[in-house]
From Swiss-Prot:
Keywords: Magnesium, Membrane, Transferase, Transmembrane, Transmembrane helix. Polyprenyl transferase; part of the gene cluster A that mediates the biosynthesis of the fungal meroterpenoid acetoxydehydroaustin. The first step of the pathway is the synthesis of 3,5-dimethylorsellinic acid by the polyketide synthase ausA. 3,5-dimethylorsellinic acid is then prenylated by the polyprenyl transferase ausN. Further epoxidation by the FAD-dependent monooxygenase ausM and cyclization by the probable terpene cyclase ausL lead to the formation of protoaustinoid A. One of its GO terms (molecular function) is 4-hydroxybenzoate polyprenyltransferase activity. This is Polyprenyl transferase ausN. GO terms for biological process: terpenoid biosynthetic process; ubiquinone biosynthetic process. It comes from Penicillium brasilianum.
Length: 316
């Protein structure tokens, strides 16, 4: 079992700025790992921008900004709660994997009861934000939370736990509902945009999981990276191309034009193609996978939102 003596306190980054007693809780929430926040918050940003671009009526900018802030805070809380919950359930596995054995719970810096309380608090904070949104959002939020709670059990019973992470794609219909648009009024475009988000999430997580694939196999943790170790590249590229085509369909089916095609679809294509080319093969086991995914996700999201914002401005 790892001990506190094996652990080196952070000397830089956001964790180094915290009081020493709170650092383990910051680690538990992964506040030093922005990739997860990008992946959980950016779909809501895209959802708000997409809804603004396709809405039959012009939505006021102040209304859009207000919903964007609430949904971003929701994404922050749910991601934080999900990390703490995941570590609580995975404590036995994390002790046996070199990359995770010094996390707060395995090394004894946070008690299981403390982690459970922190998880409940963060879920509670997220739930309180729903009071500021239309009641329909509670349905989408319940789906997101259910699958967030289910995720850590997936690797024990399935070779495809990454598919559970597609719950993040519910950000698209939730964003639409928050802006008083019924996602079922546009079922095919909504499904296409959601599938595009889901494809990106699964693609990045599979590539990221390759770092631990060998050790996960030894300790019995199941994942798509373990199950499809020999064809990871093909699966990742399949998800990339299908996600890009779904994004294209989601825009075309709602009449979006050249700005969407050039900036949104083009930015998505270039950003994530760059990520795959740098991260697959020998690069999949590199510690740089997270930073590559972070920069690619940021690049793709900026261009995707810019294209949708351009479409919104054209319709003003």
């Amino acid at each position: 079992m790892p001990t506190k003596g094996d652990y080196q306190p952070p000397k830089n980054g956001i964790l180094s700025k915290l009081p020493e007693s709170t650092v383990p809780y910051g680690e538990l929430l992964r506040i030093h790992r922005p990739l997860g926040y990008y992946l959980n918050i950016s779909p809501y940003v895209v959802g708000v921008a997409y809804t603004a671009a396709i809405s039959p009526v012009t939505l006021p900018a102040t209304f859009l900004l207000g919903r964007l802030v609430i949904l971003s805070l929701w994404g922050f809380c749910i991601r934080s709660a999900g990390c703490a919950w995941n570590d609580l359930i995975d404590m036995d596995i994390d002790r046996q994997v070199s990359r995770t054995k010094l996390r707060p719970l395995p090394r004894g810096a946070v008690s299981p009861s403390g982690a459970a309380l922190l998880t409940a608090f963060m879920f509670g904070c997220g739930g309180s934000l729903l009071l500021l949104l239309p009641s329909q959002c509670a349905f989408e939020a319940a789906i997101v939370v259910f699958f967030a709670l289910l995720y850590p059990f997936g690797k024990r019973f399935s070779d495809h736990p990454q598919l559970i992470l597609t719950n993040i794609a519910w950000a698209i219909p939730m964003a639409m509902s928050s802006l008083d648009m019924n996602p079922l009024d546009f079922p095919i475009p909504t499904l296409a945009m959601s599938f595009s988000i889901a494809s990106v999430i699964v693609m990045i997580d599979i590539v990221y999981a390759c770092q631990d694939a060998e050790e996960d196999k030894k300790v019995g943790a199941r994942s798509m990276a373990v199950r499809y170790m020999e064809i990871t590249d093909q699966i990742a590229y399949s998800l990339f191309f299908s996600g890009t085509l779904s994004l294209l369909a989601g825009g075309i089916l709602r009449g979006l034009g050249i700005p969407f095609l050039i900036f949104s679809v083009g930015g998505h294509f270039v950003g994530f193609l760059r990520f795959l080319r740098a991260s697959l093969g020998n690069g999949a086991k590199s510690a740089l996978v997270e930073s590559r995914a972070k920069s690619s996700c940021l690049l793709a999201t900026v261009f995707l939102v810019f294209g949708l914002f351009f479409e919104y401005c054209v319709r003003l």
